Regions:
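Interfacial aromatic-anchored transmembrane helix boundaries in multi-pass membrane proteins
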Residues: 56-64, 88-119
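Membrane-helix interface motif
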Residues: 157-167
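Alpha-helix C-terminal capping segments
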Residues: 74-81
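Small-polar-interrupted transmembrane alpha-helices in polytopic inner-membrane proteins
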Residues: 48-52, 82-95
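Hydrophobic transmembrane alpha-helices
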Residues: 2-73
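Short helix-perturbing small/polar motifs within transmembrane alpha-helices
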Residues: 109-157
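Cytoplasmic-side transmembrane-helix entry/capping segments in multi-pass membrane proteins
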Residues: 37-46, 69-70, 84-87, 106-113, ...
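C-terminal transmembrane helix-loop-helix hairpin of multi-pass membrane proteins
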Residues: 140-150, 168-185
């Protein structure tokens, strides 16, 4: 679910960067408000590396293949560290593997990072009860992960269908996008 360079108009790519900047700022602000903000940096670094590496594990799902995303896991485990971690992972995926692109990095960060933050808040709901047992934690972990993937696929679909460039056969592209979105969900 990486949007490559050249698919979206320049204005949409710019809007993606403009929307990413305040989310990164807010995430870093929330991180700095923690009692010891440096304590979770090693955990964030390891999960950022895992997010980067698992993009090489492809699972064939006709008519395409999918790879592990881990944005729900990053959101549940890292909290506000998840958005900067995903942004860094997407940057290295774009530079080294050509998954996505540098012009669409902001849009791809929104597509993957915002659902991770939502997954974090879903996973925190397990603490409503006094004692979150293993079953409760498992249920909320599943909900967080599946909501993150579903929201990412939904954002991907909405952005591509709404803002596809004029140089494409729009009807064929939309049919392909709908098919691939269903395959991802």
């Amino acid at each position: 679910m990486h949007i490559p360079d050249g698919i979206l108009p320049a204005a949409v790519c710019g809007a993606g960067y403009a929307a990413t900047a305040p989310i990164v700022w807010y995430s870093v602000r929330k991180i700095n408000q923690e009692a010891n903000p440096r304590e979770s940096i090693p955990k964030a670094a390891i999960l950022t590396a895992a997010f980067f590496v698992v993009s090489w594990i492809h699972i064939p799902v006709p008519p395409t293949s999918v790879h592990l995303v881990l944005n729900g896991l990053l959101g549940a485990v890292l909290g506000y560290y998840a958005f900067p971690a995903i942004l860094i992972g997407l940057f290295f995926q774009a530079v080294m593997f050509q998954h996505g692109g540098l012009t669409t990095l902001g849009v791809n960060a929104i597509v993957m990072g915002v659902p991770a933050l939502i997954a974090y808040h879903i996973f925190r709901l397990r603490n409503i009860r006094r004692e979150a047992g293993r079953i409760t934690t498992g249920i909320f972990g599943f909900l967080a992960g599946s909501c993150a993937i579903g929201l990412s696929a939904g954002l991907f679909l909405v952005i591509l269908v709404s803002f596809i460039g004029p140089g494409f056969d729009v009807e064929v592209e939309r049919a392909a996008i709908y098919t691939l979105a269903v395959a991802h969900v």
